[in-house]
Amino acid sequence: MTDRMEKKTYQEIASTTQAQTTGAFIDTLNGIRLNELLRRYSVIDCHKTGAEQELLALRDDIKKLIESSRGGATGMHGFIGERVQVSFSNARAAMQGQEKAYMLIDDNGMTDYLRGKTLIQQKACISDKALGLTHVVAHSEKYPIFIQQNGIYQIPRDFYEKYQRFVNMAEETALKLRKEDLRMWKRVQEFKAAVPEAKVEPMVVTYDEIQAGAVNGTIDREMASVEKEYRKQRNAAENACKPTLQEGLKVTACSAALEGLVDGGVSILEHKQERGKIRNFEKEDWKEIGIDTAKGVGKGAVRGAAVYAATNVAHVPAGIASATVTGAFGVIENSSRYIKGECTGKECAIGIADACASAAVSAISTELGRRFIPIPFLGSLIGNAAGTLLYKVAKKPILRFFNSIMNAEPCIA
């Protein structure tokens, strides 16, 4: 009797411990994913803050510029364009976690701003009716060193689209264009002939967007674009850190292997106590060990999948989810024995009560162990082992009391 009780004790401890190990493992995985998600959120929030600060500073700068009427009615948009190009580019870089690349010079000299070490001159002009290219030629003649130092000219985005359309267009194609488009094609070709080495790039905004009456709306749209990118990055972070089928399958496989190993090991120990030494095992013994191992693999797979789904879909704590699965196994096992006629209804009820109580104690003790010993895995396992041992001590009188209630004669008034 004592041997059987000892076997039952270490078997229950091994069973509940490996069950809670699965729960602790899944809980740790979930914690790692959650911590990574929070880390990414923090980084994205910093990116957004940097971008918004850049745009808010731009709005204040533009307000002062307009109030001072710098450049007058015909030239103010040029100064606005410089600031918008610099700030928008830096805000977009901030949203991607990059350093500021643009720096405003603002000295009315050869260079309007820098992009790293690259010199940039902005030409946002319509007075020449040639996309500002006439002003580019004039600047290159005044500052020949600008192109020699690999300087770049930037024109409004809508101007650049027209420039790109005409710059490589063949003459026979151009001759089929409308009169105004043909005129523009000729101006672009004249520009390329005059300064073939000039590099032209688009600004991030159009000519109309940098006018004094429209620039605040332009900044508002960029603010909205920052918010949109912020949401996009948060969604990407959530998708990268969410539970996946692949991870669930890995957890299921690990749980199956663990439970199969534990149940197989327990079965070997039980047979060893009966046979003395492993070399004395008979064919039937190994068959039973194989069956026990296979059952463990099956239960482990079910447990791993169920706990992973419960913690990530229903957000049930891993310890409780694992204990619930253990209790369910106990209910199924005792019900199956009753259906097969291997036990009485009373024995079935007692077995189910025992399984559920054991699972509840395992869940509670595991949670207490995790809280009082905040070391991943170790706290949960120590708590579970201690709880299981205490339950074994208290179980006998509890089951005797439960049994006496079931055997009591009903009182008839």
Predicted regions and their residues:
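Interdomain/boundary linker segments immediately adjacent to catalytic/signaling cores
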Residues: 1-79
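Surface-exposed polar/charged interaction patches
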Residues: 16-19, 31-35, 44, 213-217, ...
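Catalytic centers of nucleases
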Residues: 54-140
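Cationic, glycine-rich low-complexity segments
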Residues: 129, 133-274, 285-297, 301, ...
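Membrane-active amphipathic alpha-helices enriched in small hydrophobic residues
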Residues: 245-269, 286-339, 345-406
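Charged, low-complexity interaction regions
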Residues: 277-281
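Intrinsically disordered, low-complexity N-proximal targeting/linker segments that flank membranes
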Residues: 409-413
